[in-house]
Curated annotation (Swiss-Prot):
This is Citrate synthase, mitochondrial. The active site is at 300, 346, 401. One of its GO terms (cellular component) is mitochondrial matrix. Gene3D superfamilies: Citrate Synthase, domain 1 (1.10.580.10), Cytochrome P450-Terp, domain 2 (1.10.230.10). Structural protein involved in oral morphogenesis and in pronuclear behavior during conjugation. Respiratory enzyme. It is an enzyme of class 2 (transferase). Homodimer. It catalyses: oxaloacetate + acetyl-CoA + H2O = citrate + CoA + H(+). It is found in: Mitochondrion matrix; Cytoplasm; Cytoplasm, Cytoskeleton. Signal peptide: none annotated. It comes from the Eukaryota. Pathway: Carbohydrate metabolism; tricarboxylic acid cycle; isocitrate from oxaloacetate: step 1/2.
Amino acid sequence: MRSINQLLKQASLSQKSQYNFSQTNLKKVIAEIIPQKQAELKEVKEKYGDKVVGQYTVKQVIGGMRGMKGLMSDLSRCDPYQGIIFRGYTIPQLKEFLPKADPKAADQANQEPLPEGIFWLLMTGQLPTHAQVDALKHEWQNRGTVNQDCVNFILNLPKDLHSMTMLSMALLYLQKDSKFAKLYDEGKISKKDYWEPFYEDSMDLIAKIPRVAAIIYRHKYRDSKLIDSDSKLDWAGNYAHMMGFEQHVVKECIRGYLSIHCDHEGGNVSAHTTHLVGSALSDPYLSYSAGVNGLAGPLHGLANQEVLKWLLQFIEEKGTKVSDKDIEDYVDHVISSGRVVPGYGHAVLRDTDPRFHHQVDFSKFHLKDDQMIKLLHQCADVIPKKLLTYKKIANPYPNVDCHSGVLLYSLGLTEYQYYTVVFAVSRALGCMANLIWSRAFGLPIERPGSADLKWFHDKYRE
């Protein structure tokens, strides 16, 4: 097995970059990499600028542009069979090679990757050392204080507001502290330097969002009794602590959850919305508030709670100890009534989501006796084979949402309307990394064309 240092050196050589493994200041590392990536982008435009990317149909234009390559995101891509690949690394590789909360522990109870590590990877393209992750952890701790005026703003929000509405509003409230907005308004920043205040705002937002999200949780579900931050904990572990979860298993779960949900190409609703709004030079607070609003949509961020509700309904009707035939019959009933079985199938993947496997491994070790988890795993074995018997269902494999909500529920986070906030805390990593690189690349405002129905008739009528 290759050591992490061997992997780091190989990654550096393969990308032909002069990477300083002793440098723990992320901004300085990025500043060194930006000219190389700008040169690479220039080369791509000069060499391939007139090449045809692909053809697309009227059906794709009307159908949400699915499958059309219309964006550039250098952070991750989704392979139909390997799942999400972050800067060249798969989910299993990230679990193996990214630093953990306890670097000395070799047991399976301490094997979830730290989100600090995956953010470093997204920003630099390089696997970080423990020292680099530790430096980033301390930087986020130093930036993570939420001023009392913002705390009061959240605590004065009506508790019947959806938690995602609260999060979006809190991000907009924090926008008054945007460094980019201030510099741009004063005319003190040039285009080539946009990335620097975007970096500062993005790092502040990432540092503060676990605190903001925890305040929302305690306000809405725990009588507004807040828990102070713990400076000894990492970004994800501290988030769990501030929500009120002190068990090691919950902290480990949140570390893994925030890592594997952090990015998913550039075309999903939250990432695309953040990029689109940011392309107008809206600062990171404005941009990610918009992305959060997209994530709140039932078709994007609510899938995991739909799976949980489906499974709870199944348990209410059938119990947890059932036969495979009981599951098959229930699926038949669901499909015949015109509904879908949530948690199965994916827009891109054509095999079981590696993020699902990641959570299965976690729960088999930490929650091996949990009856709901056992039932979920039984369903994941039975349902895909059953769905394949329906001619219109070609992709029946479990996705990440099949497991994530049930996992949180089994660990005691039972307020499922809050789950999308946890998702939003994670997705801030990818969205902010994309924003910083969009400004570093000098990408323009996004402005596709559109067509009315008459245009289609006039163009294609025989």
